[in-house]
Amino acid sequence: MILAAAPPAYFPPPAACAKLAAADVVVSAESFRFSRKEGTHRTAIRTMTGRRWLSVPVVGSGWPGTRISDLAIDFNQPWADEHWRVLEYNYHNAAYFYYYAEAVERIIRGAGQSLVGLLADAGQFVRGSLALRARVISSSLLPEVAERTGRLLAWAEACGCDRYLIHPGEAGLLDLPRLEAAGIGLDRIEFTEAPYHQQGPGFLPGLSLLDLLFNEGPAAAGYLQANIRIVPAD
């Protein structure tokens, strides 16, 4: 059984979804520290002028360093109306926009105060749209261990997994002999974001999964699987 861990994200790009497709169990790492540089609260779409970020405004006490689970959405800003207006304007001509539109609008407009709640709804939509069968567990339900290797061992044991999908560069941060002694193997994902049809000329990589879904529809699931390769990292 393969374990993966990743912070929850707001309609993440295909490369991030590849980890969900490759793992048997995914830990939604809500206890990780929030970073504005990550895709936790934002996603990139394609407009007539190129890439545009849609960001969910957040508030939290004592950050930077605040856990994702402790952040709330700032409803003093009309972000939901803006996100939906921008999506509808730029994708209404896409072949499958209206196939997903109702569900996506409901997620965006139905957001409560909790950022994690919004991300959980977005994650459920992503997994359902791609027919992913990985079991998702919140990190809040697992042992809290500060040290990286110890946390991985505790999570692998709790989830019944014997392999772990590493992030790029993560192997150098882990105690590899300790993992080997515990019978935990390491894998890595090789994902190639092959060009697919988009609104406009050329191809922009790294956009939200919404871009892939609106343009390719149910074929997005096959696209993702066809471009994933899992190789041993140990």
Where on the chain are the PLM-derived regions?
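Residues lining hydrophobic/aromatic ligand-binding pockets adjacent to catalytic sites
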Residues: 1-234
